[in-house]
């Protein structure tokens, strides 16, 4: 069975993604979904799948790393089967937190979405005020998904050190980078058994073509190289100003 699938978006990538998240929530019988809580530096636990329509994984701002907040959040529902919606950097951090024994990652259904980049908080607020609605910034970032999202030089400082903006390592990984998102998104699962459990053959729009998968991976490779050069340039600059 394929572990790479597509979702046809019909011009609405956010609505399509949220509906897919709601579907897998209901199919896996989650008790809740942990998401970032808007501008607040805290996690938020959704307990009704109908609330999924209010979240926006493409929102280009990040006030805290959700993985660092999860251990405390999970104490609220110690016996619950929960999902968590993460950016790639948060997924990597979650693995580290789990390896330190701060939480049991196997009690979570992890969902990771390609990151289109984030602005510094003050710039995000300024741009939102100019556009009159912060949702416009998410839509703008999505427009540039085929090219890699917002430009690296506009990222907040932490994002400039990012290893990769590609969704990887979660049980459900959603691809948007390098793709014509008004037409299609990709779904990647590392476990064929989960694909069968979710019945992806019916809730998706079929297996992803090798060309589409390669298209995303090619852009991710270029983005990772760009990020590496950016990190090296920043570190070289620091080396020049720090005392020897």
Place the predicted regions along the sequence by residue.
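Iron-sulfur-associated redox domains of electron-transfer enzymes in respiratory
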Residues: 1-243
């Amino acid at each position: 069975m394929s572990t790479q699938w597509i979702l046809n978006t019909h011009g609405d990538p956010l609505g399509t993604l949220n509906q897919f998240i709601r579907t897998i929530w209901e199919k896996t019988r989650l008790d809740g979904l942990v998401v970032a809580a808007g501008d607040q530096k805290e996690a938020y636990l959704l307990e009704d799948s109908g609330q999924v329509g209010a979240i926006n994984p493409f929102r280009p701002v990040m006030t805290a790393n959700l993985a660092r907040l999860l251990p405390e959040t999970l104490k609220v529902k110690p016996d619950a089967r929960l999902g968590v919606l993460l950016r790639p950097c948060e997924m990597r951090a979650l693995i580290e937190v789990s390896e330190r024994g701060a939480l049991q990652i196997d009690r979570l259904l992890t969902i990771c979405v390609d990151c289109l980049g984030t602005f510094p908080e003050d710039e995000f607020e300024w741009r939102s005020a100019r556009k009159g609605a912060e949702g416009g910034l998410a839509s703008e970032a999505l427009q540039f998904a085929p090219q890699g999202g917002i430009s690296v030089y506009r990222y907040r400082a932490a994002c400039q050190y990012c290893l990769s903006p590609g969704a990887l390592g979660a049980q459900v990984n959603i691809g948007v980078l390098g793709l014509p998102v008004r037409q299609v998104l990709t779904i990647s699962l590392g476990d064929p058994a989960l694909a069968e459990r979710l019945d992806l053959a019916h809730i998706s729009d079929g297996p992803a073509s090798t060309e589409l998968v390669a298209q995303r991976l090619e852009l991710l490779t270029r983005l990772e190289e760009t990020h590496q050069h950016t990190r090296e340039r920043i570190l070289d600059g620091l080396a020049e100003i720090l005392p020897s």
